[in-house]
From Swiss-Prot:
One of its GO terms (molecular function) is metal ion binding. Its cofactor is Zn(2+). It comes from Helicobacter acinonychis (strain Sheeba). This is Threonine--tRNA ligase. Its EC number is 6.1.1.3. Keywords: Aminoacyl-tRNA synthetase, ATP-binding, Cytoplasm, Ligase, Metal-binding, Nucleotide-binding, Protein biosynthesis, RNA-binding, tRNA-binding, Zinc. Gene3D superfamilies: 3.30.54.20, Anticodon-binding domain, Bira Bifunctional Protein, Domain 2, Threonyl-trna Synthetase, Chain A, domain 2. NCBIfam families: thrS (TIGR00418). One of its GO terms (biological process) is threonyl-tRNA aminoacylation. SMART domains: tRNA_SAD (SM00863).
Length: 612
């Protein structure tokens, strides 16, 4: 079965066997010249077809078990697929095995999956009385509506799909959740069931193993266990509280970045948290981003709490006149921003309403875009290497709706391509995926579980400089508009620390660990020695704690190990008298002895090992 053709890829779309027949091609997909074959396997394009068909298999099974069920949409998403539906029956996680069993029953029945195309009038009549399908149709333009059928079940869908349910043998329903109709909180709440599907048994097995590993590494769980952060309902959803250890971790990353930024010619700036709505109207945020912003009124003047830092940095630029000799100007800020995220999408530190970006804006000439982006790519590589992340880049090009002329866009896009080429970076191209005001590069990191995360962005902006009428005096003494480059490498400290926590499973490397060394005095008489050593380590900028609880030595050591502290030092008579320390080193997975002075020199050196 692995060699069977299930669809083709042509003109950036997947065309399944049934769609080829509907197009009137008697030989099916074979008649589609210049197309790329898609075989039944675990490749990305094949999985899109497989998972889409598995979503329909889920809907068919739900209809069989709950005849009153009505269905909204069932798309393929990054984590598999889901279907939104409603029924008068109460459905819980405990019902998933029963639904899954029904899916397997239909899969074994080897039902042919067929397609027909209806006019809008025919589709409205076919799904008469189904308000959810009518809601779907209201969002579709044109007069061609695809309907896929299998074993008496049919659903409105554009595809692509497998030719038969016999292909669907390796799937799993993963969770049940609620979802508002169309993602709008004003609409009714539907039931959403998620699932995953693969062509092979190995693919499903590996994925389920990864899911279990991800549960163990969940940063929300680690945040509590390691005392990094918390949330409080009395404060509000999506508003994290950084506890001392989490704040230390974050500060260490901030300090390392600041040192590197200053060496790379960035200047620290700081903008206000609230700005008059007038500037948000100039920037376009008021018209295009208002629903994601918070507003307040002071002295009858409306203010917007900033969702982004760019406007503040523009005003810093405008605070003085600039010549071409001043450029590039690089401003950075650890900017706190607020965005109104719907409660249903909030997720630990990964999705919050208040977060801090490692934000920077570079004001430069067109000719400087390539060199500035090249420097950012170099910076990115050093940061990712320090944290043991592999990463990939994606270049997004001009969308259909955009500002600026073709030559300007081509020049800006080529500058990004040349910068990527200079660093020998293989990158994907998202044709038409850029913002309306300029091309961009997205930075996607891969963690220890092979999960990909969108973090940083390098965005060329030709819109805001025009809106705010930014200028510099060029070498011919004429006013010229600068280009603005938005740049965040981590994205936000909250999101990056969540990813970092799961990547290392809380075993943070020494240079950023929230507690780097713990000192365990065996008895009270060793406590003074521990405090003196603590002071020596603090002078060397080491985060150190003395564990002097009234517990047994073994219990204190186990507690320190559970806290995933890189180095544990047990201090007794021998260590105090000889000043030769006993060290338990987590990173080396070893125990060894070292003279005090040598140890102090070693940890001092370890703090210098990493730089960006």
């Amino acid at each position: 079965m692995s060699a069977e053709l299930i669809a083709v890829y042509k003109d950036e779309q997947i065309i399944d066997l049934e769609s080829a027949k509907v197009l009137g091609l008697s030989d099916g997909v074979k008649a589609l010249k210049g197309s790329e074959p898609i075989y039944f396997d675990d490749s990305p394009l094949a999985l899109e077809v497989i998972r889409h068909s598995c979503a329909h298999l889920l809907a068919q099974s739900l209809k069989a078990l709950y005849p009153d069920a009505k269905f909204f949409v069932g798309p393929v998403v990054e984590e598999g697929f889901y279907y939104d539906f409603k029924t008068a029956s109460k459905i819980s996680e405990e019902d998933l095995p029963k639904i899954e069993a029904k899916m397997k029953e239909f899969a074994k029945s080897k039902l042919a999956i067929t397609k027909e195309v209806l006019t809008k009038e025919q589709a409205l009549e076919r799904f008469k009385g189904d308000e959810l399908k009518h809601a779907v149709m209201s969002k579709i333009s044109g007069d061609a509506f695809g309907v896929y059928q299998q074993g008496g079940f049919e659903d409105l869908c554009k595809g692509p799909h497998l030719p038969n349910t016999r292909f669907l043998n390796h799937f799993k329903l993963t969770k049940l959740a609620g979802a508002y109709l169309g993602g709008d909180e004003k609409n009714e709440m539907l039931i959403r069931i998620y699932g995953i599907a693969f062509a092979t048994k190995e693919g499903l097995k590996d994925y389920l193993f990864q899911i279990e590993e991800a549960k163990k590494r969940d940063h929300r769980k680690l945040g509590v266990e390691l005392g990094l952060f918390s949330f409080d309902d009395e404060i509000g959803a999506g508003l994290p509280l950084w506890l001392p250890k989490g704040a230390r971790l974050r500060k260490r990353i901030e300090d390392l970045l600041s040192k590197a930024l200053l060496l790379r010619g960035y200047e620290p700036v700081k903008g206000p948290e609230i700005l008059k709505s007038d500037v948000w109207k100039i920037s376009g945020h008021y018209d295009n981003y208002k629903e994601n912003m918070y507003f307040t009124t002071i002295d009858e003047q409306e203010y917007g709490i900033k969702p982004m830092n760019c406007v503040g940095h523009i005003k810093v630029y405008q605070s003085a006149l600039h010549s071409y000799r001043d450029l590039p100007l690089r401003f950075y800020e650890y900017g706190v921003v607020h965005r109104h995220e719907k409660s249903g999408v909030l997720h630990g530190l990964l999705r919050v309403r208040e977060f801090t970006q490692d934000d920077a804006h570079i004001f430069c000439s067109f000719e400087q875009i390539q060199s500035e982006v090249s420097a950012i790519l170099d910076f990115t590589h050093k940061i990712m290497k320090a944290f043991d992340f592999s990463y990939e880049m994606e270049l997004s090009t001009r969308p259909a709706k955009s500002i600026g002329d073709d030559k300007v866009w081509e020049k800006a896009t080529n500058a990004l391509k040349e910068a990527l080429k200079e660093h020998h970076i293989n990158y994907k191209i998202d044709e038409g995926g850029g913002a309306f005001y300029g091309p961009k590069i997205d930075i996607k990191i891969t963690d220890a579980l092979k999960r990909k995360w969108q973090c940083g962005t390098i965005q060329v902006d030709m819109n805001l400089p025009e809106r705010f009428k930014l200028a510099f005096t060029n070498e011919h003494n004429n006013a010229e508009q600068p280009v603005m480059i938005h740049r965040a490498i981590l994205g936000s400290f909250e999101r990056f620390i969540a990813i970092l926590s799961e990547h290392f499973w809380g075993n943070f490397p020494f240079f950023v660990a929230p507690t780097q060394i713990v000192l365990i005095p065996i008895n009270e008489e060793h406590h003074v020695f521990a405090l003196k050593l603590k002071e020596e380590l603090k002078k060397r900028d080491i985060f150190v704690e003395v564990l002097d609880k009234n517990d047994s030595l073994n219990k204190k050591v186990r507690l320190a190990e559970k806290q995933k502290i890189p180095m544990i030092l047990v201090l007794g008579n021998e260590e105090m008298e000889t000043e030769i320390l006993s060290i338990r080193d987590r990173e080396k997975q070893a125990q060894y002895k070292m003279p005090l002075k040598e140890f102090l020199n070693m940890v001092e050196s370890k703090m210098q090992e990493v730089s960006f």
